[in-house]
Regions:
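TPR/TPR-like (Sel1-like) alpha-helical repeat modules
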Residues: 1-6, 167, 173-187, 216-223
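Amphipathic alpha-helical repeat scaffolds of TPR domains
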Residues: 9-37, 63-89, 117-132, 153-156, ...
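TPR-repeat structural position
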Residues: 48, 101, 137-138, 172, ...
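Amphipathic alpha-helical segments of tetratricopeptide repeats
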Residues: 60, 109-113, 145-150, 183-192
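Acidic, Ser/Thr-rich low-complexity linear motifs
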Residues: 188-203
């Protein structure tokens, strides 16, 4: 971000706007000004809020730009990461955690309805799977999941992502298949790049674990 800020004069208007928005979340100044007690690996609620607020006008300004849409949706999701939906333990009823959940789902679905390109946009499909996997209707994300099965075969995490929906709708075979493909994609990536970072190892292990978990539910002992 510091480098981006230093060369903004050579960037397009869109690029400048995105750099400024990202600087509210990732710049050294923003990090230094954040409450140290809330920082977790550079992450904090106040920085996430600042970024989401900075992206809101850009979503309006660049209406129809699918990349901007994806960045805004992700910014909204990070306000309540993995807590977009609440489940009542007594009744099992699942409801949106807050209005931001409804907003980001509406934004994604508006994009899909407005543009055929959006329906195959990797980031939008990825985010839609995450947005609905713990919702009352994960099956609505099946078309997005199906896109990700083959859209970017070299990116292990995206190859794996359909299983986040498959598992909730009982498509165990499909979940197993896409995770095996994801493991193979990860292996190819490591062979080509030599990247063995601990963070990437976690993602690789997640795919292996998903294969075992889904095979267990499907009774596929040999898998």
């Amino acid at each position: 971000i510091q480098q981006g800020l230093s060369v903004m004069g050579h960037c397009s208007e869109l690029e400048q706007d995105l750099i400024r928005a990202l600087s509210t979340r990732h710049s050294a100044e923003a990090r230094d000004a954040a409450d140290p007690a809330s920082l977790n690996m550079g992450n904090s609620p106040e920085l996430n809020v600042a970024f989401a607020e900075a992206m809101a006008p850009l979503y309006e300004k660049y209406a129809g730009n699918l990349d901007v849409t994806a960045i805004y949706v992700e910014a909204l999701m990070n306000l309540k990461a993995w807590q977009l939906w609440d489940k009542n333990p007594a009744t099992g009823e699942i409801t949106p955690a807050d209005d931001n959940t409804l907003l980001l789902v509406d934004i994604l679905e508006d994009a899909f309805q407005s543009s055929d390109e959006a329906k195959v946009h990797p980031a939008l499909c990825h985010l839609y799977c995450h947005a609905l996997e713990l919702s009352p209707f994960p099956e609505k994300a099946l078309p997005a999941a199906d896109v990700l099965r083959t859209r970017m075969p070299g990116l292990g995490h995206l190859v794996h992502m359909p299983s986040h929906i498959d598992a909730w709708v009982g498509q165990w075979k499909e979940a197993i298949d896409c995770n095996i493909a994801a493991v193979e994609a990860d292996d190819r990536y490591v062979e080509i790049t030599g990247n063995e970072s601990q963070f990437y190892k976690f993602y690789r292990m997640h795919n292996h674990h998903f294969v075992v978990w889904c095979a267990m539910f499907d009774g596929q002992y040999e898998t």
